[in-house]
Amino acid sequence: MSKVILTTEVSGLGSPGDVVEVKNGFSRNYLVPQGFAVIWSRGGEKQIEQIKAARAAREHATIEEAQDLKSRLEAKIVKLTVKAGQGGRLFGSVKTSDIAKAVEESGIGQVDKRKIEIPNPIKGTGNHEATIRLRDDIVATISLQVVAAK
């Protein structure tokens, strides 16, 4: 058995910075060559403590940024201009990429289209809602105003 320090998330073993004990072949043939871990040493453990402290500080900063973005998203109505036919029926539907682009153009900030969830397909003009999962614990609900292009 050999001790290694994980440098990335490895399912079943742990998160970056964890010191784990694995079989020699697993560490020598898989973890170390793939860059998932480094061989344990006293100096390496001190370095890992510094990395964990820096990661905790970054984590705190990203939480504050996400809270700020959430308040800006919920305070403003995002306007989407799309092609529509008679009666306000859209040609197609509004996609998450359209919402992400509209949020960025409105000056609120950048949002990843994969984090946007639309509860019901948007196939008509009017007011709608969508949720954006900024982090696992921070979810913003945005108001959308879908308008027909002229």
From Swiss-Prot:
Pfam families: Ribosomal_L9_C, Ribosomal_L9_N. Gene3D superfamilies: Ribosomal protein L9, C-terminal domain, Ribosomal protein L9, N-terminal domain. Keywords: Ribonucleoprotein, Ribosomal protein, RNA-binding, rRNA-binding. One of its GO terms (biological process) is translation. PROSITE patterns: RIBOSOMAL_L9 (PS00651). GO terms for cellular component: ribonucleoprotein complex; ribosome. GO terms for molecular function: rRNA binding; structural constituent of ribosome. SUPFAM superfamilies: L9 N-domain-like (SSF55658), Ribosomal protein L9 C-domain (SSF55653). Belongs to the bacterial ribosomal protein bL9 family. Binds to the 23S rRNA. This is Large ribosomal subunit protein bL9. It comes from Clavibacter sepedonicus (Clavibacter michiganensis subsp. sepedonicus). The gene is rplI.
